[in-house]
Swiss-Prot record:
Region of interest (Domain I, interacts with DnaA modulators), residue spans: 1-84
Protein name: Chromosomal replication initiator protein DnaA
Localization of this protein: Cytoplasm
Keyword Nucleotide-binding: yes
GO biological process per UniProt: DNA replication initiation; regulation of DNA replication
Subunit details: Oligomerizes as a right-handed, spiral filament on DNA at oriC.
Region described as Domain II: 84-131
């Protein structure tokens, strides 16, 4: 009965919740009914607390509907699927060990190299050396915000239960938003949990280079064996596979082999899978088999938190008002923020001056001037009009049809986020509208970004275009 009862609840929750929420928080739950107690198992404490906080009332309501007076009591526990025991490693000769100790990028003609390991610890160290995972990028130094919350939660779940939670996990968004940091954080967490795990991180171009060298050295079988033997494969910027047919063909088979073996795949891209041109449809389809999550430009509070965290790492005191001054003017990505802060700190060290708003304005004058020049209300209006294939005059008009009103609201919200203009100034720029109209538009778009995947995508695309 437990499976059918929970299945009914799942089906109803799937209708009620946004697809991303359902896939991330509810789908991973497992159910067991014993002695009129329904136990829901979450893959980790983070998911358990989130589900209990956000969805407990909905689950209890559905149990009441389906069970009437015989409602089972509800319990939550942290539990994970049993992991199959690893297969015993085949006996290897010293030549085999030496051959496997080189990543495919260095594949050459096979020569027996007599090399022995003192103990298993050396072998593990070698695996970690080959992984290319940056030990500096961990979950504990990743600054969480509304813009990356879902991506961070998914990455944590994958690291706790690789190959089972979400496979593949596909993270997409503009440059410098933290996708690569999350890849490394997952890799580090997997190895922390299991030092014997084979985790490989690489840029997609490295995969292509490895394959080309393997073909040149007649070592394609070694190439296949290397990539298909990993426990987790983390590939950055998958869009660089575009128009590389042979690489796509090989990755297609590698992808299938890893999925069949319950080995984790995490991919990143600068755009949504279906928007990647030059990549075969069968690959784009597979990219969406697991969970696809957008990493968006950080909102103001997150930008401030990032600056404060980086200043702390440098053992520099950064006043709140200074952090807000920088964060309000540099909005596009984390990398830009870090670069600006590094310049400010360097200037302060060279001159011995305290870091004040006036000092920051002087140290970053060229960067701030460029930013103000790039993002103007006029530029926003032109970009939004072009995106929705309407005229700028429509945005300034009194027309209230959905095809014009929604782009106008989006443009107002973008103007509030990307410029330093006040609400009355924004209203004036949109046909002399009142500041309350602008405020309503901003709140409406914020609500729609939570409820509508299309609006969320449009907003992210426009921010990316305006900030590039």
């Amino acid at each position: 009965m437990s499976s059918s009862l929970w299945l009914q609840c799942l089906q109803q929750l799937q209708e009620e919740l946004p697809a991303t929420e359902f896939s991330m928080w509810v789908r991973p739950l497992q159910a067991e009914l014993n002695d009129n107690t329904l136990t829901l198992f979450a893959p980790n404490r983070f998911v358990l607390d989130w589900v209990r906080d956000k969805y407990l009332n909905s689950i209890n309501r559905l149990l009441q509907e389906y069970c009437g007076n015989d409602v089972p009591s509800l319990r939550f526990e942290v539990g994970s699927r049993p992991v199959a025991a690893p297969k015993p490693a085949p006996t290897r000769t010293p030549a085999d060990v030496a051959a496997e100790s080189s990543a495919p990028a260095q594949l050459q003609a096979r020569k027996p190299v007599h090399k022995t390991w003192d103990d298993d610890a050396q072998a593990i160290a070698d695996i970690n050396h080959r992984s290319n995972v940056n030990p500096k990028h961990k979950f504990n130094n990743f600054v969480e915000g509304k813009s990356n919350q879902l991506g961070l939660a998914a990455a944590r779940q994958v690291s706790d239960n690789p190959g089972a939670a979400y496979n593949p996990l596909f993270l997409y968004g503009g440059t410098g938003l933290g996708k690569t940091h999350l890849l490394h954080a997952v890799g580090n967490a997997i190895v922390d949990n299991n030092p014997n795990a084979k985790v490989v991180y690489m840029h997609s171009e490295r995969f292509v280079q490895d394959m080309v060298k393997a073909l040149q050295n007649n070592a394609i079988e070694e190439f296949k064996r290397y990539y298909r033997s990993v426990d987790a494969l983390l590939i950055d910027d998958i869009q660089f596979f575009a128009n590389k047919e042979r690489s796509q063909e090989e990755f297609f088979h590698t992808f299938n082999a890893l999925l069949e073996g319950n080995q984790q795949i995490i991919l990143t891209s600068d755009r949504y899978p279906k928007e990647i041109s030059g990549v075969e449809d069968r690959l784009k389809s597979r990219f969406g088999w697991g969970l696809t999550v957008a990493i968006e430009p950080p909102e103001l509070e997150t930008r401030v938190a990032i600056l404060m965290k980086k200043a702390e790492d440098h053992q520099i005191h950064l006043a709140d008002e200074v952090a807000f001054f920088i964060a309000k003017r540099l909005r596009s990505n984390v990398r830009e923020l870090e670069g600006a802060l590094n310049r400010v700190i360097a200037n302060a060290n060279f001159t011995g001056r305290p870091i004040t708003i006036d000092f920051v304005r002087e140290a970053l004058r060229d960067l701030l001037a460029l930013q103000e020049k790039l993002v103007t209300i006029d530029n926003i209006q032109k970009t939004v009009a072009e995106y929705y294939k309407i005229k700028v005059a429509d945005l300034l008009s009194k027309r209230r049809s959905r095809s014009v009103a929604r782009p106008r609201q989006l443009a107002m919200a973008l103007a509030k986020e990307l410029t330093n203009h006040s609400l009355p100034e924004i209203g004036d720029a949109f046909g002399g509208r009142d500041h309350t109209t602008v405020l309503h538009a901003c709140r409406k778009i914020e609500q729609l970004r939570e409820e509508s995947h299309d609006i969320k995508e449009d907003y992210s695309n426009l921010i990316r275009t305006l900030s590039s």
